[in-house]
UniProtKB/Swiss-Prot annotation:
Gene3D superfamilies: Ankyrin repeat-containing domain, Arf GTPase activating protein, P-loop containing nucleotide triphosphate hydrolases, Pleckstrin-homology domain (PH domain)/Phosphotyrosine-binding domain (PTB). GTPase activity is stimulated by oxidative stress. The keyword Lipid metabolism does not apply. The keyword DNA damage does not apply. The modification Phosphothreonine is found at residues 359, 361. GO terms for molecular function: GTP binding; GTPase activator activity; GTPase activity; polyubiquitin modification-dependent protein binding; zinc ion binding. Belongs to the centaurin gamma-like family. Its main location: cytoplasm. This is Arf-GAP with GTPase, ANK repeat and PH domain-containing protein 3. Widely expressed, with highest levels in brain. It is found in: Cytoplasm.
């Protein structure tokens, strides 16, 4: 973090990165040069409004990371310079002049803090127009006339940044005008939505400059993506300065500039000035609509043959950059709601846009056709409601998960006294949820529905199970067992809490507690039994033999099984020959043909059960065996997908989007990290976090004995590396650490890789415990605590490490000035410095300290917008109280002070 004036950039770079400032009630703001603009190019912050095409040169491939770092550096350079001005103001002896200058600086600072990137809603669309031409072109007079209605003859060499409201097709836009002081550069080309080329009709050089600027712009960006307007100014034409560029030459140039529109203007009395900017705004809006129509069908319907054209009035003009700036664009929502139809009229398209917010609705069903992604059931005897559901299965909007399987199933009621079978509209989604509604209408209206999280469930078919194991064979070891399903079942059972399970695997409806093979299977405290794993293979189900009813152990969970007593027997399914009066199952001694009878009866219904680890059961029944098979397989696939998603969740959060190997390699490549910090053994793979250094495995064992207050040891390959720890390791390294801890060797020799452990331990303890070789502090009359504050402000990492190594707990917790209360941790949090914040906490700075206004370091981190610093502080117990308190600025201006700006101010301790 650089607090040098200008953020280490040239004035031209600062100008090109600056955006329009905010603050002030004027309809437009004139901020020449843009030195106090908001962070990021433009109000939306964020690069080109259209994707660059046509194979741009290599220099255009500027990474987002580099651009972001440059913008942060520019942004953070403003406040230190402003506060340096405040310090200089204090030296002015004339108090009246001092107060006047201070008020002006405060106004500038407030305009910077309240720029549109911090205040303007992302829903406000923007148009970014660049004005280019040489100093004699008259472009500054053109812009000034448009903004103020007056004529100013002077040309602005540095250009300017301006804002004005403009209305296009009945919609208001924030027009950002960038008067470029020189030729178009890469950043300018990436920023603009449109370009106005300006030349003077009485100046040949300005005329020739236009085409040179055009060629330069084309080297950075495809000219077909940028609307252009050519303007010839008449302001300087007089008897002494006659017209040099005739109309034919000007129109020939407009043809060379991709046939752009040509205007002649006069800023003296306003000829065509308003028309130029209105026309360029119209061109930008029209281009965006054209791109929306081109992108929309491809985005939602990659295989659609054709779409009818949509009039411009039917689609609201929306800034295409909103997708980048605000997270989503209105158009992306619009395009995702276009249905999968070969041809769509304008009227239907408007209906779809209106109905997209409530998914699905009866309006959406009017223009639907039968979906071809679900299999037809022409051979099945389905009732009318089921056929209607099948015809309208694609009536699913973008607001809900798309089902991978859906249809009408019978579900048994969970009420103990009246367990009836009722029709339900059941959907299985790819997010691991099984939902059911009383009807298709309720599903489409998203009401009266219930859902089952399949993560901790299994699916079973009553009367069918895995082949029974013999007493000498462990359950589940049959060669025909499905290993994948067994593994899933074990994972589910292992993840349960509060419910004991046995090691053996049996069927939920056929427990055998008296058998030696199932001796471990008995009801738990909540009536739970160990369940067998689900196997979707039909031959495994068919091989299972039903047990006699006298040997069946009834389930005692919340929902009774089908083998329970006669008085609790639920009524048979309506699908079973549609007989509502089927007789009760016999619970007496079975006949010799009992098993076959049970199998025949099981074939009459096509039921399957979803069972959770908590003992809940949901009974469903399909119309055919094939349909049940498909449902069971689909549910099992989603159970497996849910489990796999849980297993990979940790991997996704370890390094965010970074690859572990790349992150570790980045730590290894830091200067000095190729050798152990203590014995110089090659390729160290252990780390000390607070030292920011790598070491060999033998030295790491010695460091562990030092204690975590001296060295926090972690494996480079075996442990997790969150971003904040990686930031510390990559910022420091062995070379920096040894420049501090071995800064005063005075002839001592380090032990080598072949030295014995005792010798290495003596060296390490002398180095870190006794601090015998610690580099001396620089000679200064400033106390150590104040030097620490200075090191944080100046972003001096080596000095910070040295001061922390020398300092006591009282010294590192010293505050800045009397009555201020800010510690070094407050300052590092306000500066969003993750490395300094983490090191200060490790070396004993109090995370609970508060400044004079009652603010904790967490409040400073949140005001600075640093989620990384906030996470570190919360992890170490920093309280969040006080983050909403308004700080009291140190300076005491009369009016207009912005409290939030004070948190960005680094203390003036130099």
């Amino acid at each position: 973090m650089n607090f040098q004036a200008g953020g280490g950039q040239s004035p031209q770079q600062q100008q090109s990165l600056a955006a329009p400032g905010g603050g002030g009630a004027a309809a437009q703001q004139l901020v020449c040069g843009g030195q106090f603009g908001g962070a990021g190019p433009g109000a939306g912050g964020g690069g080109p409004s259209q994707q660059l095409a046509g194979g741009p040169p290599q220099q255009f491939a500027l990474s987002n990371s580099a651009a972001i770092r440059a913008e942060i550096q520019r942004f953070e350079s403003v406040h230190p310079n402003i506060y340096a001005i405040y310090d200089l103001i204090e030296r002015i002896e004339d108090l009246a002049l001092q107060n006047q200058i201070r008020e002006h600086v405060i106004s500038i600072e407030d305009s910077f803090v309240n720029s549109q990137e911090w205040t303007l809603s992302r829903s406000v669309p923007e148009l970014k127009v660049g004005i280019v031409g040489n100093l004699s072109s008259g472009k500054s007079a053109l812009v000034h006339r448009y903004l103020t209605g007056t004529y100013v003859q002077e040309e602005s060499p540095e250009g300017g940044r301006f804002k004005k409201e403009i209305v296009v097709d009945g919609q208001s836009y924030l027009l950002l005008i960038r008067d470029e002081g020189g030729p178009p550069e890469l950043q300018f080309a990436a920023w603009v939505d449109a370009v106005v080329f300006v030349f003077s009709l009485e100046d040949e050089i300005s005329f020739q400059t236009v085409y040179n600027y055009f060629l330069r712009l084309c080297s950075f960006r495809n000219a077909s993506e940028v609307p252009m307007v050519l303007v010839g100014t008449q302001d300087a034409i007089s008897a002494a300065n006659p017209r040099v560029i005739d109309d034919s030459r000007a129109r020939k140039l407009s043809t060379d500039l991709k046939r752009c529109t040509y205007y002649e203007t006069c800023a003296t009395y306003g000829l065509n000035v308003e028309r130029v900017f209105q026309d360029v705004a119209q061109k930008v809006v029209a281009l965006r609509k054209k791109q929306q129509l081109a992108i929309g069908p491809c985005k939602s319907l990659p295989n659609s043959p054709s779409h009818s054209a949509v009039s411009a009035a039917s689609i609201p003009a929306v800034h295409i950059n909103q997708a980048t700036n605000g997270g989503s664009s209105a158009f992306s929502d619009y395009s995702s709601s276009v249905p999968s139809t070969p041809s769509i009229s304008q009227r239907e398209l408007r209906i779809e846009t209106i109905a997209a917010s409530s998914t699905p609705t009866p309006i959406r069903k009017q223009s639907k056709r039968r979906s071809n992604i679900f299999t037809s059931r022409k051979g099945a005897d389905l009732d009318r409601e089921k056929k209607a559901a099948e015809c309208r299965v694609d009536s699913i909007g973008s607001g809900r998960a798309i089902p991978i399987k859906q249809g009408i199933l019978l579900k048994r009621s969970g009420k103990s006294l009246n367990k009836e079978w009722k029709k339900k509209y059941v959907t299985l989604c790819d997010n691991g949820l099984l939902t059911y509604h009383p009807s298709l209408h309720d599903y489409m209206q998203n009401i009266h529905g219930k859902e089952i999280d399949l993560l901790r469930t299994t699916v079973k078919v009553p009367g069918k199970r895995l082949p029974r194991a013999t007493p000498t064979t462990a359950p589940g070891t049959s060669p025909r067992a499905n290993g994948l399903a067994m593994e899933r079942s074990n994972t589910q059972l292992g993840g349960a809490t509060g419910a004991p399970h046995s090691a053996s695997s049996t069927s939920l409806h056929s427990e055998r507690p008296h058998s030696s093979a199932w001796a471990g299977s008995r009801p738990g405290p909540e009536g739970l039994h160990q369940r067998s794993c689900s196997v979707s293979s039909t031959d495994q189900w068919s091989e299972a033999a039903a047990l006699p009813a006298s040997m069946q152990h009834p389930a005692s969970g919340p929902a009774e099984s089908l083998s329970s007593s006669p008085k609790l027997e639920p009524p048979p399914s309506p699908h079973s020959n549609r007989k509502k009066h089927r007789g009760k199952k016999s619970t007496g001694t079975p006949r010799p043909d009992g098993p076959s009878s049970a199998a025949e009866e099981a074939e009459e219904s096509f039921e399957f059960v979803v069972v959770s680890l908590t003992g809940q059961t949901w009974h469903f029944e399909a119309s055919t065996a094939e349909e049940r098979e498909l449902w069971v397989q689909s549910v099992q696939a989603q159970i497996l997908a849910s489990l796999q998603g849980c297993r990979s969740a940790k991997d996704k959060t370890r390094l965010g989007n970074q690859n572990t190997a790349l992150a570790v390699q980045a730590v290894r490549t830091v200067r000095g990290n190729s050798l152990c910090i203590d014995c110089e053994a090659p390729n160290p793979d252990w780390a000390s976090l607070n030292l920011g250094a790598l070491m060999c495995i033998e030295c790491s064992g010695i460091h562990r004995h030092l204690g975590a207050h001296l060295s926090r040891v972690r494996s480079l390959d075996l442990d997790d590396w969150p971003p904040e720890l990686l930031a510390v390791m990559t910022a420091m390294g062995n070379a920096l650490a040894n420049s501090v801890w071995e800064g005063a060797l005075d002839g001592y020799s380090k032990p080598g890789p072949e030295a014995c452990r005792e010798e290495k331990e003596r060296w390490i303890r002398a180095k870190y415990e006794q601090k015998l070789f610690l580099a001396p502090l620089p000679s200064s009359d400033v106390p150590l605590g104040q030097q620490l504050l200075r090191a944080v402000v100046e972003d001096d990492l080596r000095l910070l490490v040295m001061l922390l190594a020398h300092g006591s707990k009282e010294e590192v917790n010293e505050t800045y000035g009397d009555g201020d209360g800010r510690t070094a941790l407050h300052l590092s949090s306000a500066m969003a410095n993750v490395v300094f914040t983490q090191l200060l906490i490790w070396y004993g700075v109090d995370v609970r300290s508060r400044d004079a206004r009652g603010l904790t370091p967490l409040a400073y981190a949140r005001r600075a917008g640093s989620q990384e610093c906030a996470d570190i502080l919360i992890q170490h117990g920093c309280p969040g109280e006080g983050c909403g308190l308004a700080p009291t600025p140190n300076r005491e201006p009369a009016n207009g002070t912005n409290p939030s700006a004070e948190l960005h101010r680094s203390p003036s301790i130099l």
